[in-house]
Amino acid sequence: MAELDIGQHCQVQHCRQRDFLPFVCDGCSGIFCLEHRSKDSHGCSEVNVVKERPKTDEHKSYSCSFKGCTDVELVAVICPYCEKNFCLRHRHQSDHDCEKLEVAKPRMAATQKLVRDIVDAKTGGAASKGRKGAKSSGTAAKVALMKLKMHADGDKSLPQTERTYFQVYLPKGSKEKSKAMFFCLRWSIGKVVDFAASLANLRNENNKLTAKKLRLCHVPSGEALPLDHTLERWITKEECPLYNGGNVILEYLNDEEQFLKNVDSYLE
């Protein structure tokens, strides 16, 4: 009787056994019997080849350059002054002790002079009138402060002595016109902006170079406060200070915009 052509011969030279259910090696693609189906048993030519597989879940991360900080971000957050990478918590100059912080001071001095000129123009330039206006603003802020303390949102873990309260007027087009908030006196303006944005659920793309920046603006001058200054610095200023219990404005501005226009329209 003729032999049926069923199955295949094992490719191991000293074996050549016909197997009706042969195994195909996924390494060398050879045909083998049950005894020689493992790579070791048939001396597979591919057994020592290491195939690199792409890691589909691997993401590039960026470590913070601030000493002692172990935070990482999925996007690069580079300080435009010292050009080092930081986490969102340390991205502002004052928060990472930027080595280039002094460079901005001459420009800020000129900006402060411009603010004084604007305020003087609005008040007629009279010193006595200016002092009277400042006293009036301070008194109004003290009255407002008592009301703000009753319903302001903020970090409840902050000591009472470090809390500073504001009526924060939100960007045009927001669902709410304003929101009472309190912040730590020692925070940088940049951190105040980030915290206020989270409380009011505002879009905050301050870490993107091309996007409009969310800025905290002085009332009544409309000056966009430098992100690296501290809140305490503006509370203790002799000229054009921020008042605990006073008003501030949040708005999206381009990098070249240093002042907010139509300040009164936010307060109406």
UniProtKB/Swiss-Prot annotation:
Binding site for Zn(2+) 1: 10, 15, 33, 36
Region (ubiquitin-like): 160-260
Keyword set includes Glycoprotein: no
Any one biological process term the GO annotation gives: positive regulation of intracellular protein transport
Binding-site list for Zn(2+) 3: 64, 69, 87, 90
Modified residues (N-acetylalanine): 2
Zinc fingers (AN1-type) by residue: 4-52, 58-106
Residues bound to Zn(2+) 4: 79, 82, 96, 98
An example Gene Ontology molecular-function term: proteasome binding
Annotated protein name in UniProt: AN1-type zinc finger protein 1
One GO cellular component term noted in the UniProt record for this chain: cytoplasmic stress granule
